[in-house]
């Protein structure tokens, strides 16, 4: 029996990161977490490209451009959508998650969804490096593992 499991080694891998600028005080912490993870696992700064977009809604389009460029072993999507008093949250969070999943499936490149979708600012802060860890770090870890797994399966 052969078991496939992606290694947690980023040496030689190239990563694209798409960052939604809206709620930047939260998203900047997600980006720091992602970069920390990639570097700790052997990624070189020259193998990491960061692209800023206005907000989470724009993430799928740029993640598609990055994934289909074939320059990256994985693309990491970072953003923060925080519920307000209108249905805007539901539209944005739903479309971003669907869009990112679609890009990953169509491109055959791991496109990792690390966009926070929280009910309030406190939950976002908790997931950006305090009580609940850092979802940017977690997303980078998933990107490393999936990039290696794809290589293993090819």
Curated annotation (Swiss-Prot):
Binding-site list for (2S)-2-hydroxy-3-oxobutyl phosphate: 85-86, 127
Active site: residue positions: 88
One of the protein's GO biological processes: riboflavin biosynthetic process
UniProt GO cellular component terms: cytosol; riboflavin synthase complex
Enzyme class: transferase
GO molecular function per UniProt: 6,7-dimethyl-8-ribityllumazine synthase activity
Record flagged with keyword Transferase: yes
UniProt keyword list: Riboflavin biosynthesis, Transferase
Enzyme Commission number(s) of this protein: 2.5.1.78
Catalytic activity: (2S)-2-hydroxy-3-oxobutyl phosphate + 5-amino-6-(D-ribitylamino)uracil = 6,7-dimethyl-8-(1-D-ribityl)lumazine + phosphate + 2 H2O + H(+)
Keyword Metal-binding: no
SUPFAM superfamilies listed in its UniProt record: Lumazine synthase
Lineage: superkingdom: Bacteria
Binding site for 5-amino-6-(D-ribitylamino)uracil: 22, 56-58, 80-82, 113
Pathway this chain belongs to: Cofactor biosynthesis; riboflavin biosynthesis; riboflavin from 2-hydroxy-3-oxobutyl phosphate and 5-amino-6-(D-ribitylamino)uracil: step 1/2
InterPro entries for this protein: LS, LS/RS, LS/RS_sf
Pfam families: DMRL_synthase
Cited Gene3D superfamilies: Lumazine/riboflavin synthase
TM segment ranges: none
Summary of the function given for this chain in its UniProt record: Catalyzes the formation of 6,7-dimethyl-8-ribityllumazine by condensation of 5-amino-6-(D-ribitylamino)uracil with 3,4-dihydroxy-2-butanone 4-phosphate. This is the penultimate step in the biosynthesis of riboflavin.
Sequence similarity: Belongs to the DMRL synthase family.
Protein name (record): 6,7-dimethyl-8-ribityllumazine synthase
Protein source organism: Clostridium kluyveri (strain ATCC 8527 / DSM 555 / NBRC 12016 / NCIMB 10680 / K1)
